[in-house]
From Swiss-Prot:
Organism, as annotated: Mus musculus (Mouse)
The protein's name: Odorant-binding protein 1a
Signal peptide limits: 1-16
Function (record text): Binds the chemical odorant 2-isobutyl-3-methoxypyrazine.
Top-level division of the source organism's lineage: Eukaryota
Cellular component GO terms held in the UniProt record: extracellular region
Length: 163
């Protein structure tokens, strides 16, 4: 019983640390056109919110289309595996947290667009620019997921949308 309570407490603390204000620092994708400036999956995150014991995760972000920042909130629904969330945005999306530190959260996502094309993505959220060590770790993770390191885009410096 004690192990179960410790596990539940740890799970709750991890999700509590995940909630709050976060900004997209970098994005990687195997279809790099989707994350270039003006790309439909180049999102500028603002916050994560867990609801219903984190069975629902709300992600609030901006997309910048034609020079206009549009605020969007999506809700991801936790799937039976207890790790993956599913939502709709520019097609069907499945995403999960793959790395976590006090400074950054890294999510792996797969998007299947309306033309039935699959895109693998990594999003790293944080509060400031990545260190050299963090960049290297992100590049290694991208390669592990089948995303060329050359397809990483640092987006924090291009985020001109409102806070």
């Amino acid at each position: 019983m004690a192990k179960f309570l410790l596990l539940a407490l740890t799970f709750g603390l991890a999700h509590a640390a995940m909630e709050g204000p976060w900004k997209t620092v970098a994005i990687a994708a195997d279809r790099v056109d989707k994350i270039e400036r003006g790309g439909e999956l180049r999102i500028y995150c603002r916050s994560l919110t867990c609801e219903k014991e984190c069975k629902e995760m709300k992600v609030t972000f901006y997309v910048n289309e034609n020079g206009q920042c549009s605020l969007t909130t999506i809700t991801g629904y936790l799937q039976e595996d207890g790790k993956t969330y599913k939502t709709q945005f520019q097609g069907n999306n499945r995403y999960k947290l793959v790395d976590e530190s006090p400074e950054n959260l890294t999510f792996y996502s797969e998007n299947v667009d309306r033309a039935d094309r699959k895109t693998k993505l990594l999003f790293i959220l944080g509060h400031g620019p990545l260190t050299s060590e963090q960049k290297e770790k992100f590049a290694e993770l991208a390669e592990e997921k089948g995303i060329p390191a050359g397809n990483i885009r640092e987006v924090l410096i291009t985020d001109y949308c409102p806070e």
